[in-house]
Amino acid sequence: MANQDLIPVVVNGAAGKMGREVIKAVAQAPDLQLVGAVDHNPSLQGQDIGEVVGIAPLEVPVLADLQSVLVLATQEKIQGVMVDFTHPSGVYDNVRSAIAYGVRPVVGTTGLSEQQIQDLGDFAEKASTGCLIAPNFAIGVLLMQQAAVQACQYFDHVEIIELHHNQKADAPSGTAIKTAQMLAEMGKTFNPPAVEEKETIAGAKGGLGPGQIPIHSIRLPGLIAHQEVLFGSPGQLYTIRHDTTDRACYMPGVLLGIRKVVELKGLVYGLEKLL
């Protein structure tokens, strides 16, 4: 395959935990070409991103200015893709910038509000530019969510516990919110009160997510990403759990997102809609 037929990819947050895995995955993919690596770490500026992530040099320097790197992705025959694993505080502007340049975002950064997602969807539709926002790229997580949707038909009580490393900035996780949304869309009323409740410590029972489903967030060093969906009824407890033991598990989903987003003309929320 000639270089002009490869999908150009920019990775934003290239030196972060997820960004490093994306760089490695894109470098190994025969149909993708890394054309830009963005990271704000001042000690890495100008360094070859391949060497930064511990693989062979890729002749792609680490740069801090997203705008200038997006220009590189617009100079190729095929529309480029920006993969964003950065920070909730900046992801909205990152996605708008990419769409404005005609570069298609694949977003794993969580923390966007419903209104921000709606605004980005309107912007992408007007630009006829594909955009994928996925709370989680692990296929196992999608299977967990599907199993939870099936189970909720038979249980009236459900709560979600999500556990992440203590460097995660947002809580609850996008995956937990998405799971609660999927359950709420089933139209059931969950967790009818059994007694008059009183919290002696505010928030002890977790925050209420979509469908008034309690979500509990835990942040500890030593964790990566984990989630439990707990269903209860008299005499039984049904627990569905997913554990991430290595961030490599997200890469098949990220690569799928890159390949699919170039076919889209607007925003899609959730990787499961592309399967």
Curated annotation (Swiss-Prot):
Claim: Protein biosynthesis is one of the keywords in the record: no
**EC number(s) of the enzyme?**
1.17.1.8
Give the binding site residues for (S)-2,3,4,5-tetrahydrodipicolinate: 165, 174-175
The active site annotation covers 164, 168
Q: What is its main location?
A: cytoplasm
InterPro entries registered for this protein in UniProt: DapB_C, DapB_N, DapB_N_CS, DHDPR_bac, NAD(P)-bd_dom_sf
Its BP terms in the Gene Ontology are:
diaminopimelate biosynthetic process; lysine biosynthetic process via diaminopimelate
- Which pathway does the protein contribute to? Amino-acid biosynthesis; L-lysine biosynthesis via DAP pathway; (S)-tetrahydrodipicolinate from L-aspartate: step 4/4
Q: Keywords for this entry?
A: Amino-acid biosynthesis, Cytoplasm, Diaminopimelate biosynthesis, Lysine biosynthesis, NAD, NADP, Oxidoreductase
User: Which is one Gene Ontology cellular component term of this protein?
Assistant: cytosol
Location in the cell reads: Cytoplasm
Question: Catalytic activity annotated for this protein?
Answer: (S)-2,3,4,5-tetrahydrodipicolinate + NAD(+) + H2O = (2S,4S)-4-hydroxy-2,3,4,5-tetrahydrodipicolinate + NADH + H(+); (S)-2,3,4,5-tetrahydrodipicolinate + NADP(+) + H2O = (2S,4S)-4-hydroxy-2,3,4,5-tetrahydrodipicolinate + NADPH + H(+)
Q: Which HAMAP family does its entry note? A: DapB (MF_00102)
The UniProt similarity line reads: Belongs to the DapB family.
- What PANTHER family does the record tag this protein with? 4-HYDROXY-TETRAHYDRODIPICOLINATE REDUCTASE 1, CHLOROPLASTIC-RELATED, DIHYDRODIPICOLINATE REDUCTASE
Q: What is this protein called?
A: 4-hydroxy-tetrahydrodipicolinate reductase
Q: Which organism is it from?
A: Synechocystis sp. (strain ATCC 27184 / PCC 6803 / Kazusa)
Taxonomic lineage of this organism?
A: Bacteria, Bacillati, Cyanobacteriota, Cyanophyceae, Synechococcales
